[in-house]
Amino acid sequence: MYKYCFRKPACISYRGIRFMSKASDTDPTLANASSAKRSAFESREKAKEDFFVHQHEIEQLRKLKESLKLHREELDELESRVDKKMKSNE
C-alpha cells in the first residue's frame, strides 16, 4: 500500500522552468546600460535621502533656536529681578 504513496512521477515536467540567460551576459552594451540605469537610480535615491536629512537638520536647528530664544528671555527676566533686588538692598 505504501509503495503507491511514495512513488516517483513517471515524467518530470519542465514547463515551469525558464532556461534563459541574462541579456547582459551576451551583449556588453546592455550591461553598461543596466549599470547606467542602476547608477541613475542610486543617485536619485541618494539625492532624496540627502534632501530628507537636510530638511530634518533644518527642523532641529529651528527647534533649538526657539528653545534658545525662550531660555534667553527667561535669563533676561531673572537678571532684571536680581538687579531690582540689588537696587532695593542698597
UniProtKB/Swiss-Prot annotation:
Coiled coil: 42-89
Gene: inh1
Source organism, top-level taxon: Eukaryota
Protein name: Putative ATPase inhibitor, mitochondrial
Family: Belongs to the ATPase inhibitor family.
One biological process term in Gene Ontology: regulation of mitochondrial ATP synthesis coupled proton transport
Pfam families the record matches: IATP (PF04568)
UniProt keyword terms in alphabetical order: Coiled coil, Mitochondrion, Transit peptide
Role of this protein: Forms a one-to-one complex with ATPase to inhibit the enzyme activity completely.
MF term (GO), any: ATPase inhibitor activity
GO terms for cellular component: mitochondrion; nucleus
Subcellular location: Mitochondrion
Entry keyword Cytoplasm: no
